[in-house]
Amino acid sequence: MSGSQTLVVKLGTSVLTGGSRRLNRAHIVELVRQCAQQHAAGHRIVIVTSGAIAAGREHLGYPELPATIATKQLLAAVGQSRLIQLWEQLFSIYGIHVGQMLLTRADMEDRERFLNARDTMRALLDNNIVPVINENDAVATAEIKVGDNDNLSALAAILADADKLLLLTDQAGLFTADPRNNPDAELIREVNGINDALRSIAGDSVSGLGTGGMSTKLQAADVACRAGIDVVIAAGSKPGVIGDVIADISVGTRFHAVDAPLESRKHWIFGAPPAGEITVDDGALSAILERGSSLLPKGIRRVEGNFSRGEVIRVRSLAGRDVAHAVTRYNSDALRMIAGHHSQQIAEILGYEYGPVAIHRDDMIIN
């Protein structure tokens, strides 16, 4: 790929700490140097940084605290300001300004908030400012889980309209087996499409300070590739890794973007975490997959979770297959009432209606 590129670089806690209990500042300095070099060459760089909790623990002198959500939020609240200050100081050496964006998944679930976040991201990039993104762990609850910043980096890549997403980790890439305990494990260099076989070999490599594993990196790669973004998983310790990815030099594992990426308005649907799920019968499944039809209430067998009209939900088959992500036209209570009924009965059952379909085909993304 030639010309100016937009690259999102995700740095996990294991990369920022080198597997220790404190931030490895010497290594972070080197990564900033690489980013600054590419920035000076005309490329647009976005940083997705983990490490707030590790920075907070370090600043407080490594207290022995219970491993609870409240403790993680406490450490994140203390560490986040330290972390952004570090990024700001290091990039300022090269005359580069940074702009902090703290996000939660809720910013991606709502279309208006998604567009606002996208506009902020692109304004920063248009003014040669490096966005530094982290999850707002100090207020998030369910968000502090395995894979948050992996998946967040894919969403950041979508917001930035990125060309590539680089997931830096403590492994050289995706292997055929866990290289830590299998000497025959081989590095997978190229991936065209993520399937169940790949998912089954993606073992976890979670450090004590972070919340990410290889399986969540596959999830992030899937989201980004379907949005038309190439993804590379590589070792953060590899010299010149950021420049290599920009220059299309083979490094780590490269996931190629799909040939027909999702249209822009559907990006947020695919990236948003489902607020609930519905199970459809075989007739509805066939209509959705083979004829591209909308989902009628008649085909709904089961509704799980509590969600509002307009939220993203998961559609499953009777066999448990994850069929689609979609925006529902009715809330969960209404769907439970009209499930299995003909569309003509909606108004009679509910006393109102938002149309004859539960999910319109234009608001559905097939997995």
From Swiss-Prot:
<dbReference type="GO" id="GO:0003723">
    <property type="term" value="F:RNA binding"/>
</dbReference>
<dbReference type="InterPro" id="IPR005715">
    <property type="entry name" value="Glu_5kinase/COase_Synthase"/>
</dbReference>
<dbReference type="GO" id="GO:0005829">
    <property type="term" value="C:cytosol"/>
</dbReference>
<dbReference type="InterPro" id="IPR001057">
    <property type="entry name" value="Glu/AcGlu_kinase"/>
</dbReference>
<feature type="binding site">
    <location>
        <position position="149"/>
    </location>
    <ligand>
        <name>substrate</name>
    </ligand>
</feature>
<keyword id="KW-0028">Amino-acid biosynthesis</keyword>
<dbReference type="InterPro" id="IPR041739">
    <property type="entry name" value="G5K_ProB"/>
</dbReference>
<keyword id="KW-0547">Nucleotide-binding</keyword>
<dbReference type="GO" id="GO:0004349">
    <property type="term" value="F:glutamate 5-kinase activity"/>
</dbReference>
<feature type="binding site">
    <location>
        <position position="50"/>
    </location>
    <ligand>
        <name>substrate</name>
    </ligand>
</feature>
<dbReference type="InterPro" id="IPR036393">
    <property type="entry name" value="AceGlu_kinase-like_sf"/>
</dbReference>
<dbReference type="InterPro" id="IPR011529">
    <property type="entry name" value="Glu_5kinase"/>
</dbReference>
<dbReference type="InterPro" id="IPR002478">
    <property type="entry name" value="PUA"/>
</dbReference>
<comment type="similarity">
    <text>Belongs to the glutamate 5-kinase family.</text>
</comment>
<dbReference type="GO" id="GO:0055129">
    <property type="term" value="P:L-proline biosynthetic process"/>
</dbReference>
<feature type="domain" description="PUA">
    <location>
        <begin position="275"/>
        <end position="353"/>
    </location>
</feature>
<dbReference type="InterPro" id="IPR015947">
    <property type="entry name" value="PUA-like_sf"/>
</dbReference>
<dbReference type="InterPro" id="IPR001048">
    <property type="entry name" value="Asp/Glu/Uridylate_kinase"/>
</dbReference>
<keyword id="KW-0808">Transferase</keyword>
<feature type="binding site">
    <location>
        <position position="137"/>
    </location>
    <ligand>
        <name>substrate</name>
    </ligand>
</feature>
<dbReference type="GO" id="GO:0005524">
    <property type="term" value="F:ATP binding"/>
</dbReference>
<dbReference type="Pfam" id="PF01472">
    <property type="entry name" value="PUA"/>
</dbReference>
<protein>
    <recommendedName>
        <fullName>Glutamate 5-kinase</fullName>
        <ecNumber>2.7.2.11</ecNumber>
    </recommendedName>
</protein>
<comment type="function">
    <text>Catalyzes the transfer of a phosphate group to glutamate to form L-glutamate 5-phosphate.</text>
</comment>
<keyword id="KW-0963">Cytoplasm</keyword>
<dbReference type="InterPro" id="IPR036974">
    <property type="entry name" value="PUA_sf"/>
</dbReference>
<feature type="binding site">
    <location>
        <position position="10"/>
    </location>
    <ligand>
        <name>ATP</name>
    </ligand>
</feature>
<dbReference type="Pfam" id="PF00696">
    <property type="entry name" value="AA_kinase"/>
</dbReference>
<dbReference type="InterPro" id="IPR019797">
    <property type="entry name" value="Glutamate_5-kinase_CS"/>
</dbReference>
<comment type="pathway">
    <text>Amino-acid biosynthesis; L-proline biosynthesis; L-glutamate 5-semialdehyde from L-glutamate: step 1/2.</text>
</comment>
<keyword id="KW-0418">Kinase</keyword>
<feature type="binding site">
    <location>
        <begin position="211"/>
        <end position="217"/>
    </location>
    <ligand>
        <name>ATP</name>
    </ligand>
</feature>
<keyword id="KW-0067">ATP-binding</keyword>
<keyword id="KW-0641">Proline biosynthesis</keyword>
<feature type="binding site">
    <location>
        <begin position="169"/>
        <end position="170"/>
    </location>
    <ligand>
        <name>ATP</name>
    </ligand>
</feature>
